[in-house]
């Protein structure tokens, strides 16, 4: 009787072990099926309706306008005082995306913001907006151009309106502020008829200002390129553009350009920022067209550089 009970218990134990083994195999099979297969591409995935987007504020900046273009006026947009704060909000999970200016037709690379992108090693680029920029001189209602003694704007706004200022307000004091919209806000709140701001026409509505002069930018084809950033893994699926950072010595740059030519890759933009270790060593922020992820992988074999992939994305 005792022997029979012992045999029965041992049999049950074996059966239980077999059942656990089967369940484990099934679980592993499910996990394997859910993994991305080797060589599979990662697409850009954006839920515009539920997006929370951090941007350089206050309300009325061109960056806010770029947010509306990319996200089709869906989601919610949260203004921050600086681009660094806007990107940090993304990194800390307070927002799901951040939109930052990257380059302007007249002002060139927006250096501070390029540095911010380089410093945040976990972010990816999931989209781009090329926005036509029309600069305007805004002032309190009833103000005349002859009254203006001080002009506020972001340094890009100042650069873009420099020729007009030299011709029409040569004696005005020009003061740099954190954004074009911040300049408009200061004029509205300061209530000084001697002050004006270079900003978007939208700021006239937001801050109840008059447009004293429209379209004062130096170039009628003035545009700014904005990047849409995310904490998602960098997308590898084929798209209009691809961006990456190459880190290395300037002497090796011709070799990288030759490698791009061999891969039939079109260079869209290249910005260099010092590595701050040795003279001649740089971060190169590179955006290109006609470049698949496979082509990028070949480029990343170029000697003399280390690489950081930012993503494949389309342009709005």
What are these regions (language model features)?
Residues 14, 18-316:
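Domain-level signature for soluble enzymes in the chorismate/prephenate branch of the shikimate pathway
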Residues 1-10:
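N-terminal secretory signal peptides that target proteins for export/translocation
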């Amino acid at each position: 009787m005792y022997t029979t009970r012992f045999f029965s218990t041992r049999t049950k134990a074996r059966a239980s072990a077999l059942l656990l083994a089967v369940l484990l195999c099934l679980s592993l099979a499910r996990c394997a099926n859910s993994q991305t297969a080797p060589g599979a591409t990662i697409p850009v995935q954006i839920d515009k309706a539920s997006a929370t987007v951090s941007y350089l504020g206050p309300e009325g900046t061109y960056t806010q306008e770029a947010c509306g273009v990319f996200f089709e006026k869906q989601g919610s947009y949260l203004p921050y005082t600086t681009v660094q704060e806007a990107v940090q909000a993304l990194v800390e999970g307070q927002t799901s995306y951040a939109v930052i200016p990257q380059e302007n037709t007249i002002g060139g690379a927006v250096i501070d913001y390029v540095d911010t992108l380089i410093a945040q090693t976990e972010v990816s680029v999931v989209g781009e907006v090329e926005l036509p920029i029309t600069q305007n001189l805004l002032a309190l209602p009833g103000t005349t151009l002859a009254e203006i003694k001080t002009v506020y704007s972001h340094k890009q706004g100042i650069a873009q309106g420099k020729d007009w200022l030299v011709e029409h307000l040569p004696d005005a004091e020009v003061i740099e502020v954190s954004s074009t919209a911040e300049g408009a806000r200061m004029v509205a709140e300061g209530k000084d008829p001697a002050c004006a701001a270079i900003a978007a026409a939208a700021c006239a509505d937001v801050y109840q200002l008059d447009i004293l002069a429209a379209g004062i930018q130096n170039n009628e084809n003035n545009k700014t390129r904005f990047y849409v950033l995310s904490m998602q893994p960098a997308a590898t699926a084929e798209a209009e553009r691809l961006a990456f950072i190459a880190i290395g010595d300037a002497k090796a740059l011709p070799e990288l350009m030759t490698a791009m030519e061999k891969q039939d890759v079109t260079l869209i933009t290249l910005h260099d920022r010092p590595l701050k270790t040795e003279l001649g060593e740089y971060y190169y922020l590179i955006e290109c067209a006609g470049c698949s992820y496979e082509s990028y992988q070949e480029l990343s074999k170029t000697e003399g550089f280390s690489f950081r992939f930012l993503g494949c994305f389309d342009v709005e």
